[in-house]
Amino acid sequence: MYSANPTLGYYVPPLDVNNLTDQQTAISIEHLSLYYQQSRALSDISMRIPKGQVTAFIGPSGCGKSTLLRCINRMNDLVEGTRVEGEVKLHGKNIYHPDVDVPTLRRRVGMVFQRPNPFPKSIYENVVYGLRLQGIKNSRALDDAAEQSLRAAALWDEVKHRLHENAFGLSGGQQQRLVIARAIAIEPEVLLLDEPTSALDPISTLTIEELIHDLKTKYTVVIVTHNMQQAARVSDHTAFIHMGKLIEYADTDSIFTSPLKKQTEDYITGRYG
């Protein structure tokens, strides 16, 4: 798969994810293992995720792809008995270092979950919620941020005349775009999407997929999906995870047309998984 270069206006070959420079890397995962109590969920994973592109994690149910995603903003910390070995570096800084402030990390690495989870507030208050937590009180600044975020999430034209209505009045697809707007309002560097369309209808799914293409012009996007066709459509690079191990990681076109590992080929062609 070739990646659009929004600056130059033409298509360029994808980066070689196995030979990224530090300048090209947003997230560096180094010998990462994760344990729930005594059970190992991830085993010695090392990979680099490039800046400003979409990386997909695929694999069978229970393979560890969502667990790996949640390591990138330490959401697994919320699960009792979790232990992590190895490092996850965001722009060169290990996010598991004791000095790291986790709330600040999660502002830098936003996350959107499988099912839309708007707050029981107005559309407007959902979008500016994180900004208010940061102490921003200026009405003009909040208004501008709300509009910019809703536009970026391809939702502004649908809700601009109903900003103060309850967010629960939106459709499922609209709610998911609202959640994306809420995530990007605080200007994260990375956006994590955990099966963001699995609960949506096909039309809403297409809208979200088109949005993902737009988002990568400003953010590094990492998506977990059980839908291989979706991974092929939206991602520049794909990692195949199986039984907590990284089996293969390359540009998406190579993964889907000429995988190097038999396990990857078997999964892609439906022989197991």
From Swiss-Prot:
SUPFAM superfamilies: P-loop containing nucleoside triphosphate hydrolases
Enzyme Commission number(s) from the entry: 7.3.2.1
Catalytic activity annotation: phosphate(out) + ATP + H2O = ADP + 2 phosphate(in) + H(+)
Membrane-topology descriptor: Peripheral membrane protein
GO CC terms, sorted: plasma membrane
Keyword annotations from UniProtKB, A to Z: ATP-binding, Cell inner membrane, Cell membrane, Membrane, Nucleotide-binding, Phosphate transport, Translocase, Transport
UniProt superkingdom: Bacteria
Residue ranges of domain ABC transporter in the record: 27-268
Protein name, UniProt field: Phosphate import ATP-binding protein PstB 1
Encoding gene (name): pstB1
